[in-house]
């Protein structure tokens, strides 16, 4: 049975109260969903899933009653500690039971171009690994690189910088095709598979590769049979409990919820 990793990136949507409500309601609905879909229990139990609330809402996770639901941070500081107002370190995140951290997300790179690049992301990755938080390293080629046929070169260059002196068996790679953001154009499963296979070739077949790009409960099954894909980084589709439950029960056998 193939294991899938499903991480819901909540971006800047839920308030602290809404986050508390999600964890409370999720515990109830998760139990109901399992009871109503016994055919999916083996897949749910085999999968790994979590959510990434906003930084100020991470401690709401203390009310979570579903141990299988892991906590992910949307970002972290490249520095260990010091006079860095507004920053949150890996050491701090470890102390509140954060299991995963997004590193180098495309939106961070886009809106913070002076500070978010491969070099700063590399430092975040090293901090994450040091404090036993699994970094979810976001990479992807630009439209210019894609149009010029430089996808492989772009991915290779990113990985060379991001994984320098990093234990690759302690990381997850998330492929975000930058060229598709805001264009209405999404990559085909074949394109996702090609890049996923490339990432495995450049790293190791044991490194989990996720796909992040307008994934939802309606199209996720288009990607589940890709041999080199190991999971999904999901955006707005993870905000609603009913949709998220369908996402975390994803499997390559085509078994659907009732």
UniProtKB/Swiss-Prot annotation:
GO terms for cellular component: cytosol. The active site is at 105 (electrophile), 176 (proton acceptor). InterPro entries: Aldolase_TIM, TIM_sf, TrioseP_Isoase_bac/euk, Triosephosphate_isomerase, Triosephosphate_isomerase_AS. Substrate binds at residues 9-11, 182, 214. Keywords: Cytoplasm, Gluconeogenesis, Glycolysis, Isomerase. Its EC number is 5.3.1.1. It is an enzyme of class 5 (isomerase). Pathway: Carbohydrate biosynthesis; gluconeogenesis; Carbohydrate degradation; glycolysis; D-glyceraldehyde 3-phosphate from glycerone phosphate: step 1/1. Transmembrane segments: none annotated. GO terms for biological process: gluconeogenesis; glyceraldehyde-3-phosphate biosynthetic process; glycerol catabolic process; glycolytic process. It catalyses: D-glyceraldehyde 3-phosphate = dihydroxyacetone phosphate. It holds the Pfam family TIM. Its main location: cytoplasm. One of its GO terms (molecular function) is triose-phosphate isomerase activity. It is found in: Cytoplasm. Homodimer. Involved in the gluconeogenesis. Catalyzes stereospecifically the conversion of dihydroxyacetone phosphate (DHAP) to D-glyceraldehyde-3-phosphate (G3P). Belongs to the triosephosphate isomerase family. This is Triosephosphate isomerase.
């Amino acid at each position: 049975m193939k294991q899938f990793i499903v991480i819901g990136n909540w971006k800047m949507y839920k308030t602290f109260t809404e986050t508390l409500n999600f964890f409370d309601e999720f515990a109830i609905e998760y139990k109901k969903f399992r009871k109503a879909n016994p055919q999916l229990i083996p897949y749910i139990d085999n999968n790994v899933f979590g959510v990434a609330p906003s930084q100020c809402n991470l401690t709401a996770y203390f009310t979570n009653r579903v141990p299988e639901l892991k906590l992910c941070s949307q970002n972290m500081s490249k520095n260990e500690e010091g006079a860095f107002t507004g920053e949150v370190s890996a050491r701090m995140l470890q102390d509140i039971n954060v299991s995963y951290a997004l590193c180098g997300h495309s939106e961070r790179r886009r809106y913070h171009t002076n500070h978010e690049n491969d070099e700063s992301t590399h430092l975040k990755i090293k901090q994450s690994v040091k404090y036993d938080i699994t970094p979810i390293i976001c990479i992807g080629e630009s439209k210019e690189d894609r149009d010029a046929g430089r996808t492989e070169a772009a991915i290779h260059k990113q990985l060379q910088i991001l994984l320098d002196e990093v234990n690759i068996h302690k990381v997850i790679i998330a492929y975000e095709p930058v060229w598709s953001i805001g264009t209405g154009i999404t990559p085909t499963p074949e394109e996702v598979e090609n890049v996923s296979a490339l990432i495995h070739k450049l790293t190791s077949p044991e490194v989990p590769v996720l796909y992040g790009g307008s994934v939802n409960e309606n199209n996720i099954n288009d990607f589940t049979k890709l041999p080199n894909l190991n999971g999904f980084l999901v955006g707005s589709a993870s905000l609603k409990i009913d949709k998220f439950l369908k996402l975390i029960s994803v499997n390559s056998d085509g078994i659907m919820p009732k």
